[in-house]
Amino acid sequence: MSNSLLILGSTGLVGGQVVKFAQTSKDFSKIFTVTRRKPEFANTASTTESPRIDTIVETDSSKWPQAISNLEPAPLAYISAFGTTRANAGSAEKFKEIDYGINYESAKAAKEAGAKVCVLVSSYGANAKSPFLYMKTKGELENAIIDLKFPYTIILQPGVLLGERNESKGFGNDWAVKFGKLCKGTWFAPLLQPIEASDLGRIAVEFAERGLKGEFRENVLKVSGSELTELVDDFKIV
């Protein structure tokens, strides 16, 4: 296949896994990543970057939309696993600027460039009416992405993400991850809906592939919590 894929957030826990599984896909001949720093792709077979991957390093994220507009061939599928936390951003305003602003403008640029499928990694409990900043921002972003009207928009709403991170996401998130590991597979799992980042990355790539093949009846799909964990055994991209 001659389809190209754009991945945002490739230096993160989930994004690195998206890159890993995209490399095994037969549906993408070209994989673009746009990032502030050159990523160390997670668990790749070798330390050499795949020739199918083109990494655009741009330290000024406000220039990412223009960089996306200039991609050749234009990506037909777009996956965003990009995001941060208030603790890492430093303030509520900066958090929204990163988590909502960069995500929205990049998705808009991908849509205008011709992308047919958008897969957004959001969060379990995302709700634009939530009193909590994180959930509210995620919900607002979901609504804004849906309003862009990609032919297919798939929103993944995972619970606690399990896996080895390169940096802390703040005390609250670190605590949730530790508890999520303990409760995975137990009766307490529905509280946090834990999922391995590798499984979520695999699922994101699978949805992008299926979207390009027109396998969905609905234009907008939301897959949340336990629905994602149920897909782990169904989606096999290995």
From Swiss-Prot:
DNA repair in keyword set: no
Keywords: Membrane, Mitochondrion, Mitochondrion outer membrane, Transit peptide
InterPro entries: NAD(P)-bd_dom (IPR016040), NAD(P)-bd_dom_sf (IPR036291)
Membrane disposition: Peripheral membrane protein
A single BP term in Gene Ontology: import into nucleus
Keyword hit for Mitochondrion: yes
SUPFAM superfamilies listed in its UniProt record: NAD(P)-binding Rossmann-fold domains
Gene Ontology terms: cellular component: mitochondrial outer membrane
Entry-linked Pfam families: NAD_binding_10 (PF13460)
Subcellular location: Mitochondrion outer membrane
Family under the similarity heading: Belongs to the FMP52 family.
Name of the protein in its database record: Protein FMP52, mitochondrial
Organism: Lodderomyces elongisporus (strain ATCC 11503 / CBS 2605 / JCM 1781 / NBRC 1676 / NRRL YB-4239)
Lineage, top ranks: Eukaryota, Fungi, Dikarya, Ascomycota, Saccharomycotina
Gene symbol of the encoding locus: FMP52
